[in-house]
């Protein structure tokens, strides 16, 4: 295999750009792919929320129903189809086959589906159901009433898990050597946050086009047209980069040698039952899974309440979308800052436990302030008057800050400590444990919060009525999160110490074996001399 002489990087370059010139051929298209996938993810995430929350007869209460009854089953169906296609198609054909449904649906949505929504949506049937069923089922009825918007929501959710987690990272892990991954992957993370900095203003610009439109033109329809046009252009770049990688990079022995990469252990495919069984047998893995589940549930509990406040403040879809674009931009700014200057330093200075506790403490503090403002807004008149705003707008801004701080600490600290927790484990635990957590924790994190909210909605009837109970549920889950992190830290330190002891013994044994050989060689050398 051809090797290129590589000089060590200086301190500044190793921090900012640890890439050799000849590696740009591989890094830049991968960086661009990840940037475009993340750019599309932000556009779809903000647009799906705007569509559902501001739709006629709908609101944030529809989101838990969509996530549990549509997103989770759709993800299962997709994985079954994907498994079947992976046995039939080549890797390149499979990538394009997975990308194509997204391109087709999101191209048709602004051109055909949205303009004819009045024909496609069963408004009369939904009105009949609403008259019969209790108010707690409003979210379920809204899901049926605006089923094309719900389909948009499902495809948008799948984009993140399919294109980002499965297709991109699956491709990257397959073609990237471990020595490259240590340098490349951090840059991809920066690319995702740079995508937030660009997609946020793009959403704001598209949403504010209404000011230049004439009478009789649907401003949100025009905004959708431009947003989906950006999405499709980005998809074209993704496909082009993937083609380039296969045509020019994977044929270059400097960057890709299948024989070398066969040594990488593939991730086992585990069923839900097998994953449960594996997690229950390992307290270490069970605690790690609890961290992931608790994060997913907590974010879900706060987000839906925040989005209901957001709808009351911005009932117009263009205004709602513009706010979400600004929110995405500031999420990117804060995430980049925290990742570069806070994340690694906290773990290096204060250790794993502190790094693992920052995110739940942040969610607890900011969540408490947010829920207090929502529940006791009538008692905060003095604070509201001093700030020169309204109770509703204050709740919206505090909710946005809560989301931004929670997600930025999650990206910089929670994800890092979660991955660090795998390091002291043996290879089987790393591979099987990660597979089990991906299957169980990821699904329960998303659907757990939705299940809690659905139960409370049916009983309480509305988001405002169930907010105090959501606050109690949030604090209870954070207590579980903090306890799990503390217990896992003890196991992590013990496993790390055992791993270091094992490595020290192996090193000592290797040196002991090498020393007699060195003694045998020395006389031979003296005799020759």
Swiss-Prot record:
Regions that span the bilayer: 24-44, 63-83, 93-113, 124-144, 149-169, 184-204, 220-240, 284-304, 322-342, 356-376, 381-401, 463-483
GO molecular function: ATP binding; ATP:ADP antiporter activity
Disordered, as annotated region: 509-529
Keyword field contains Membrane: yes
Bilayer topology term: Multi-pass membrane protein
Compositional bias (Low complexity): 509-520
Domain of life: Bacteria
GO cellular component, one term: plasma membrane
Swiss-Prot/TrEMBL keywords: ATP-binding, Cell membrane, Membrane, Nucleotide-binding, Transmembrane, Transmembrane helix, Transport
Annotated compartments: Cell membrane
Pfam families the UniProt entry points to: TLC
Family, as annotated: Belongs to the ADP/ATP translocase tlc family.
PANTHER family, per database record: ADP,ATP CARRIER PROTEIN 1 (PTHR31187:SF1), PTHR31187
Protein's recorded name: ADP,ATP carrier protein 1
The encoding gene: tlcA
């Amino acid at each position: 295999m051809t090797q290129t002489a590589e000089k060590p990087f200086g301190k500044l370059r190793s921090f900012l750009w640890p890439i050799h010139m000849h590696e740009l051929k591989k890094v830049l298209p991968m960086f661009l792919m990840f940037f475009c996938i993340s750019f599309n993810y932000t556009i779809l995430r903000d647009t799906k929320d705007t569509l559902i929350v501001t739709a006629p007869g709908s609101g944030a209460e529809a989101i838990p129903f969509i996530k549990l009854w549509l997103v989770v089953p759709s993800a299962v169906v997709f994985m079954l189809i994907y498994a079947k296609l992976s046995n039939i198609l080549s890797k390149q054909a499979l990538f394009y086959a997975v990308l194509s449904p997204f391109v087709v649906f999101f191209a048709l949505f602004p051109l055909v589906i949205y303009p004819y929504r009045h024909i496609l949506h069963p408004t009369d049937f939904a009105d009949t159901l609403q008259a019969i069923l209790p108010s707690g089922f409003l979210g379920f009825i809204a899901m049926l009433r605006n089923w094309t918007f719900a389909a948009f929501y499902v495809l948008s959710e799948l984009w993140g898990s399919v294109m980002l987690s499965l297709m991109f990272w699956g491709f990257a892990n397959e073609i990237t050597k471990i020595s490259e991954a240590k340098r490349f992957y951090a840059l991809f993370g920066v690319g995702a946050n740079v995508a937030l900095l660009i997609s946020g203003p793009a959403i704001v610009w598209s949403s504010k086009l209404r000011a230049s439109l004439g009478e009789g033109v649907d401003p949100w329809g025009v905004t959708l047209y431009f947003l989906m046009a950006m999405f499709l252009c980005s998809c074209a770049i993704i496909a082009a980069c993937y083609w380039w990688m296969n045509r020019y990079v994977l044929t270059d022995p400097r960057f890709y040698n299948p024989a070398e990469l066969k040594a990488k252990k593939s991730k086992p495919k585990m069923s839900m039952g097998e994953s449960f069984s594996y997690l229950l047998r390992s307290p270490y893995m069970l605690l790690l899974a609890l961290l992931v589940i608790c994060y997913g549930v907590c974010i879900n509990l706060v987000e839906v309440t925040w989005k209901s406040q957001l709808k009351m403040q911005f009932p117009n879809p263009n205004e709602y979308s513009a706010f979400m674009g600004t929110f995405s931009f500031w999420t990117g700014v804060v995430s980049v800052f925290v990742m570069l200057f806070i994340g690694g330093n906290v773990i290096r200075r204060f250790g794993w436990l502190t790094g693992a506790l920052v995110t739940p403490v942040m969610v607890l503090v900011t969540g408490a302030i947010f829920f207090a403002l929502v529940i006791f807004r009538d008692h905060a008149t003095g604070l509201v008057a001093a700030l020169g705003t309204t109770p509703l707008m204050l709740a919206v801004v505090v909710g946005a800050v809560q989301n931004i701080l929670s997600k930025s600490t999650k990206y910089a600290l929670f994800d890092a400590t979660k991955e660090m927790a795998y390091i002291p484990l043996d290879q089987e635990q790393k591979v099987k444990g990660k597979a089990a957590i991906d299957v169980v924790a990821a699904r329960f994190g998303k659907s757990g919060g939705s299940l809690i909210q659905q139960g409370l909605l049916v009983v309480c009837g509305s988001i405002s009525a169930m907010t105090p109970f959501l606050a109690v549920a949030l604090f209870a889950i954070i207590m579980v999160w903090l306890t799990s992190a503390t217990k896992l830290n003890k196991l992590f330190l013990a496993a790390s110490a055992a791993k270091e002891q094992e490595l020290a013994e192996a090193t000592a044994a290797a040196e002991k074996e090498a020393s007699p050989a060195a003694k045998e060689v020395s006389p031979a050398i003296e005799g020759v001399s």
